[in-house]
């Protein structure tokens, strides 16, 4: 059973979370966080060395997490592997029972903790989606037949706050034509901007999960404004966080409010709590989404 695919295909509201595999082999903390999200989210993204900072391979974490009853979304980037290695990993994921794949181009290594690492980028996210479409149809990227086809459910990312919205929408359409069945967006703070984006994106009739970044402090908000393209945390939120006597409570209420405001515009939300995963159940409750 693929809960994520079933809910998306049945047009039900979807909630996903995100966890970063560790730098090391101790998974106790990650499993504890995943356990705390059961019944609250439909699936959990496992990042692929996020920000080009080396961490455990997410495919290993996904398998172990699925064995414990938590559905995963395996992030696959094009940064570190050529087309042979990527196809090999996708076959491995399918053999392990990992179905959900989020296709991403990936961040350049220069910004991570191994800045001298050589980037690969043999293919990009659109081509990666095409690869999955081929594997699901029973052949590899070169047209060679597989002894059994995969059954992968592919998604992609989109940035509603892109400076060039027409270009972003064109890229989104390319991803859909290549096989994207759903999208997770970059973090949303400006609801009117997201509404404008969705007015254009709705013509594609492909589900979009609005990205919700849990902002922990005014300083974090300023950092996002300076370093994350397409993300603008408004002064109102920064001022609220700066003057708050209970930073955690304010952060939870802000995230909950944004979810309430965007929930009628999209097919679900993707909550990026960045270390505050234990607060996601409260955020979901604050948003009025608790069953």
Report each predicted region and the residues it spans.
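N-terminal amphipathic alpha-helix/helix-capping segment at the start of soluble metabolic enzymes
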Residues: 1-20, 24, 32, 140-151, ...
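Active-site-adjacent beta->alpha loops and helix N-cap segments on the catalytic face
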Residues: 2-7, 26-28, 52-64, 82-88, ...
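Active-site mouth loops of central-metabolism enzymes
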Residues: 14-29, 72-84, 152-167, 241-253
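Conserved, mostly hydrophobic/aromatic
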Residues: 18, 44, 93, 175, ...
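Short, acidic/polar
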Residues: 24-37, 57-58, 84-90, 163-175, ...
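Catalytic beta/alpha-barrel core
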Residues: 44-54, 76-77, 103, 181-190, ...
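Glycine-rich anion/phosphate-binding loops
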Residues: 78-96
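Active-site pocket-lining/capping segments in soluble small-molecule metabolic enzymes
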Residues: 119-139, 146-147, 157-161, 205-254, ...
